[in-house]
Amino acid sequence: MVYKLVLLFCIASLGYSVEYKNTICPPRQDYRYWYFAAELTIGVNYDINSTIIGECHMSESYIDRNANIVLTGYGLEINMTIMDTDQRFVAAAEGVGKDNKLSVLLFTTQRLDKVHHNISVTITCMEMNCGTTKYDSDLPESIHKSSSCDITINGSCVTCVNLETDPTKINPHYLHPKDKYLYHNSEYSMRGSYGVTFIDELNQCLLDIKELSYDICYRE
């Protein structure tokens, strides 16, 4: 008799455990987007002819209010830090443009155009004299001079560098993730632009990123 009661109790418990009721969750208002925070163009003195799927790798961290991202690919290591910020890097993509130019799209969790940030960028030529420092200087913001960007270049392969924060355009064919990134930075006075050139004219380092093909960087 006791065995039958235990068996009935187990059956009843099993029947209760699989019972499922649909729960209607309230809609989200704070959608999680990737914000198109910056575009970095780097010219090199060796041939890079087209975007290579799987070439770019990335790692990111957020320590003591400093957001950092490290990218490797196309013979370069790019190390970028945004100081004293609430956001962090969430993704990056790289694409090859004309005349051996590499374009890097950088995405963060929040917009950059509300607060001026100091930025540090180190570019290392992985295959050409990577142990020598070619350039190390603090560049004032060339548009509004409200923040600064220090750029360090290790090696002899870089011909020009241009960094634009809060760009107002993006490749219409870039779909990673589809409909989940924003780039409508309407406050022009909050945008920034930094540039340095060695061989190329700086205007040759200004790519039309709407014409490039990009590949998302693989997260390590």
From Swiss-Prot:
GO cellular component: extracellular space; host cell endoplasmic reticulum
Disulfide bonds: none
GO BP terms, alphabetized: symbiont-mediated suppression of host NF-kappaB cascade; symbiont-mediated suppression of host T-cell mediated immune response
Compartments in which it is found: Host endoplasmic reticulum; Secreted
Signal peptide: 1-17
Superkingdom, taxonomy of origin: Viruses
Modifications after synthesis and translation: Glycosylated by host.
Keywords: Early protein, Glycoprotein, Host endoplasmic reticulum, Host-virus interaction, Inhibition of host NF-kappa-B by virus, Secreted, Signal, Viral immunoevasion
Residues modified by glycosylation: 49, 79, 118, 154
Keyword Thylakoid recorded: no
A GO molecular function held by the record: protein sequestering activity
Record keyword Phosphoprotein present: no
Pfam families: Pox_M2 (PF04887)
The family this protein is said to belong to: Belongs to the orthopoxvirus OPG038 family.
Stated role: Plays a role in immune evasion. When secreted, inhibits T-cell activation by preventing the binding of host CD80 and CD86 to soluble CTLA4 and CD28. In the infected cell, may inhibits host NF kappa B activation.
Subunit field text: Homooligomer. Interacts with host CD80 and CD86 when secreted.
The protein, known as: Early protein OPG038
